[in-house]
UniProtKB/Swiss-Prot annotation:
Keyword Isomerase (UniProt): yes
Domain of life from the UniProt record: Bacteria
Organism field: Escherichia coli O6:H1 (strain CFT073 / ATCC 700928 / UPEC)
Name of the protein described by the UniProt record: L-rhamnose isomerase
Pathway listed: Carbohydrate degradation; L-rhamnose degradation; glycerone phosphate from L-rhamnose: step 1/3
Record carries keyword Cytoplasm: yes
Residues the record lists as binding Mn(2+): H262, D294, D296
GO cellular component, one term: cytoplasm
Substrates-to-products reaction catalysed: L-rhamnopyranose = L-rhamnulose
InterPro entries found in the cross-reference section: L-rhamnose_isomerase, Rhamnose_isomerase, Xyl_isomerase-like_sf
Family: Belongs to the rhamnose isomerase family.
């Protein structure tokens, strides 16, 4: 340990102790909160099923930064490079289109064997895996409907895809000893004025019930459902709205996924966490950064990211909230995007753990809102950065922007050689 870091650490311990915070305990708690990194930042949501195909479903990755991963080996290598620069526990979130097979596999026929390389890799790197059926970028989703499709055969195809995905998810959990959270998001909706808003929702309700009908061990697999306000080409009507999935998760006791970009721009998911937790057993968070729409910009250490982290910590939701990231920026170095976004999420969690919440609660209960605001603002000036640097050192990762040198070297040696 360098003398400078040692001095800063000792000072930080004293400063936080003065407001009743044990920084060592904060670091222990931070190691209880893995962040699930999303594989699709590495290749702009291309996947391996049809890498040259178009991205559909009302989502978009903009930019053309060179060096994106073209196959599973490259994607895993890029993930390893990113993970070396991020301290603390991590998971990986996979979509079904990231299967590996020598021959084409229909989505309703995916099996655990198509993901065995990911499982072996996760074991080697001590990671948990999460999963998602991929209900987009496919000929049978081209008209904008999947699980709510009016055509029985097409709807059944997507039901079978989701059922197969649940078995893959359970395989992850069984093999890795940590439950896989499988999130269902569908792009279903309409571009313009919709006359019958009820029938697609009735079909979706029945389809989801069929999807989750097979009983799976909750120690291996957790079902989650995700709403969205709108997508490109589905501006007027989204079948899986917030109200639909809140009702579904509540009545079926599944996990509910809250995506930071899937609501009106004036809404924030940090305010929804405490409300949803009263009704659903678990939450999955997709931390993202919407810029005027669900643009999936790289996560910043901004007010909303901090508010999300604070809600988790203040209400001791460690065992009920699963933290995932969901952004994909193709205009910058993709490894840097992972590192920036994931480190920012972890910084926000650390800052939340360093808050004197008990004291703030007392002030709030006493109606002393002046002191509450004063303490919240003074908290921002306490030396949390020194605690972060110690955390990074203990996890053998760069503490500051020197991580960028590693990314640049990898870009020069590896990424620049990709076509």
């Amino acid at each position: 340990m360098t003398t400078q870091l040692e001095q800063a650490w000792e000072l930080a311990k004293q400063r936080f102790a003065a407001v009743g915070i044990d920084v060592e305990e904060a670091l222990r708690q931070l190691d209880r909160l893995p962040v699930s990194m999303h594989c699709w930042q590495g290749d702009d949501v291309s996947g391996f099923e049809n890498p040259e195909g178009s991205l559909t479903g009302g989502i978009q990755a903009t930019g053309n930064y060179p060096g994106k991963a073209r196959n599973a080996s490259e994607l895993r290598a890029d993930l390893e490079q990113a993970m070396r620069l991020i301290p603390g526990p991590k998971r990986l979130n996979l979509h079904a289109i990231y299967l590996e097979s020598d021959t084409p596999v229909a989505r309703d026929q995916i099996k655990p064997e198509h993901f065995k390389n990911w499982v072996e890799w996760a074991k080697t790197n001590q990671l948990g895996l999460d999963f998602n059926p991929s209900c987009f970028s496919h000929p049978l989703s081209a008209d904008g409907f999947t699980l709510s499709h009016a055509d029985d055969s097409i709807r059944q195809f997507w039901i079978d895809h989701c059922k197969a995905s649940r078995r893959v998810s359970a395989y992850f959990g069984e093999q890795l000893g940590t439950p896989s959270v499988m999130n269902i998001w569908i792009p279903d909706g309409m571009k313009d004025i919709t006359v019958d808003r009820l029938a697609p929702r009735q079909r979706l309700l029945a389809a989801l019930d069929e999807v989750i009908s097979e009983k799976l061990d909750p120690a291996h697999h957790i079902d989650a459902v995700e709403s969205k306000l709108f997508g490109i080409g589905a501006e007027s009507y989204t079948v899986g709205s917030n109200e639909f999935y809140m009702g579904y998760a509540t009545s079926r006791q599944t996990a509910l996924c809250l995506d930071a970009g899937h609501f009106h721009p004036t809404e924030v998911i940090s305010d929804k966490i405490s409300a949803a937790m009263l009704y659903v057993p678990q939450l999955l968070l997709h931390v993202s950064r919407p810029v005027r729409w669900d643009s999936d910009h790289v996560v910043l250490l901004d007010d909303e990211t901090q508010a999300i982290a604070s809600e988790i910590v203040r209400h001791d939701l460690f065992d009920r909230v699963h933290i995932g990231l969901d952004f994909f920026d193709a205009s910058i170095n993709r490894i840097a995007a992972w590192v920036i976004g994931t480190r920012n999420m972890k910084k926000a969690l650390l800052r939340a753990l360093l808050e004197p919440t008990a004291e703030l609660r007392k002030l709030e209960a006493a109606g002393d809102y002046t002191a509450r605001l004063a303490l919240l603002e003074e908290q921002k000036s306490l030396p949390w950065q020194a605690v972060w640097k110690m955390y990074c050192q203990r996890h053998d990762t760069p503490a500051g922007s020197e991580w960028l040198e590693n990314v640049r070297a990898y870009e020069k040696e590896i990424l620049s050689r990709r076509g």
